[in-house]
Structures are given as C-alpha cells and as structure tokens.
Design a protein with these regions (language model features):
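C-terminal catalytic core of tyrosine-transesterase DNA break-rejoin enzymes
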Residues: 12-15, 19-26, 115-116, 120-123, ...
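Basic, Lys/Arg- and aromatic-enriched nucleic-acid-binding interface segment
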Residues: 1-24, 28-30, 38, 67, ...
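Basic, Lys/Arg-rich DNA-contacting stretches centered on the C-terminal catalytic core
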Residues: 2-4, 25, 38-71, 75, ...
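Active-site/catalytic core of tyrosine-dependent DNA strand-transfer enzymes
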Residues: 73-132, 151
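Active-site proximal loops enriched in glycine and acidic residues that flank catalytic Cys/His/Asp
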Residues: 18, 31, 39, 46, ...
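Flexible loop/turn segments at secondary-structure boundaries
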Residues: 51-52, 111-112, 148
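Phosphate-binding active sites in nucleotide-utilizing proteins
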Residues: 34
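Short, contiguous acidic/charged loop-to-helix segments that flank catalytic cores in large enzymes
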Residues: 2-5, 57-67, 105-114, 129-143, ...
Length: 157
C-alpha cells in the first residue's frame, strides 16, 4: 500500500489505526487541537458520526473508558505530522457541534466519516486482490480497534 500510486495517500491513516486501535469514528472526530505532537499524545473524548438523515454530529466516546489521552510513539506522531502537513482543508471550515479543524474533508467541505473510510478500505482490498494471487479478505476500519498492537496499548494503562 505504501508504494501504490493510488492508495499511498491513505498509508498514514491505516498505520495510525493499526498502531493505536483507535475507533474509526474517533479518528474521524479528531481535530488539530486534539493532537499534541510535542508531547506525543492524542486527546480522544469525542467521535464524529453521521446520522441516517445525513446530519453530522459529535458524540461522546462509546464508553467512559474510551475517553482517554492516548500516548503515541514517534512513528505514529510522524504519521500525524504528514497528515497535518498535507491537510487539504476547505477555505471555510465547517463547525460540527463546536468542533472544527478536522483532519480530512470531502469534496463538499464536510469532514470525512466512517462510511468514507469503509469505501476506501473496500477499494484498497479490491485493488490488492486484482493484482496479487494471494487474496486479502475484506477488512474494515473497525478491525483495527481489535489488533494485537492496539491490545498492547490498552493493557499499558
């Protein structure tokens, strides 16, 4: 994926999700204020959701334990740095329930939500399976929350 001409632009996101175990809706809700590269922490106290009637809302984390200040490694901090440097924000950033400065936006200037990333993951797997004989199973952003690396992070607390 890192060297793929199409999907290399999502490498940092996949890396962050895999190495932190962050839920995709938590990642989508991250704003520039939540990321402290100097102290290598990420504040996770909310998530971005899009309702069935297409409204964007901020909700608290899924559980009380989900509210946390997540320490990040140097390599994860570097991935966030790349995302921040390459961030393509609209001229006027939308505020969702008082939050603005999201990391990724769609063509309409709205923050990306879990569904956007699910589509990207489906396309990444499809491209891989078109190229390689050994097929990759369908993956979802939610799967990253249960990775062994994520479990190690969670057990550190």
């Amino acid at each position: 994926m890192h060297d793929d001409v199409v999907y290399c632009k999502y490498y940092e996101v996949v890396y962050i999700l895999f190495h932190t175990g962050m839920r995709i809706s938590e990642f989508c809700g991250l704003t520039l204020k939540d990321i402290d590269l100097e102290n290598r922490t990420v504040n996770i106290d909310h998530q971005l959701q899009r309702t069935s009637d297409m409204r964007y809302i901020i909700e608290t984390t899924k559980t009380d334990a989900g509210t946390r200040v997540l320490p990040i490694t140097e390599d994860v901090a570097q991935m966030f740095q790349v995302i921040i440097e390459d961030r393509n924000a609209p001229k006027v950033e939308k505020s969702i329930d008082g939050y603005s400065g999201f990391l990724f936006y769609d063509d309409n200037g709205m923050p990306l939500v879990a569904m956007h990333w699910q589509h990207r993951f489906n396309h990444m797997v499809g491209r891989y399976n078109d190229i390689y004989w050994m097929q990759m199973p369908n993956i979802t952003p939610l799967m990253y929350a249960d990775t062994p690396i994520a479990q190690i992070w969670q057990n550190r607390e």
